[in-house]
């Protein structure tokens, strides 16, 4: 591809290639992927001058954590397979997010709200590299926001564990300590994630070009497209194909490397 230099950000893990000024992003990406073949290596071609971002906007389920919280809630009442099937179709963009969420939440009616604590303690695992991503960007002056189509009862806890400064999500309604089967309106879905990015930019005096956004589902696409660097992380092919950046192999530290951070810059 005519690179004039190779700079290792982490030996054997991530490197920068200095490309010719005339290099075209799509063509160079295709060339590099073809050269790598089946090697588990992610490729991002971008302008070095503008890659360091001032805002991080991240999805939660299957992005900052390894699970889908609504599927774990459903498992508590024996309907996980039914709910997970709807989740998968929604993530693929086969069905609209909002009606799919209402349908799944209705199946949780009567579930003891206290189960959330048990799920957080015993079932949820933080995605690899997530804490380093949030803490390193914060230490370098970035604003970090967890924006989820999931539920506040989980995002408040996960945001605290990872160090996000802000979190937004949907409200699972409960009465007398049990879920009612209803979700608070309006629902935070695909459009609301992009709106959250615009609101945060306006508040901070920045633009979407100053942001990096990461998610894995169809409801993340508007946010991913709007951000200066939009990342589809281990996403379904239909989602990954529409993102500026796709990470199929690496963990969340890839979002630091693609901004030019070296491994020794990472905080935990």
Q: Language-model segments: which ranges?
A:
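C-terminal cap/substrate-recognition subdomain and adjoining C-terminal extension
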Residues: 30, 110, 115-268
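Fold-independent oxyanion-binding glycine-rich loops
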Residues: 47, 60-61, 67-68, 73, ...
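Short, surface-exposed acidic
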Residues: 6, 83, 113-116
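Active-site neighborhood of HAD-like aspartate-dependent phosphohydrolases
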Residues: 52-95, 102-103
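Non-catalytic pre-domain segments flanking phosphatase-related domains
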Residues: 1-58, 267
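Residue-level detector of short coil/turn "hinge" positions at structural boundaries
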Residues: 3-5, 43, 81, 144, ...
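Residue-level recognition of short, well-ordered coil/turn positions
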Residues: 40, 94-95, 142, 205
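Long, charged amphipathic helices and adjacent flexible linkers at domain junctions
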Residues: 49-50, 54, 90-114, 178, ...
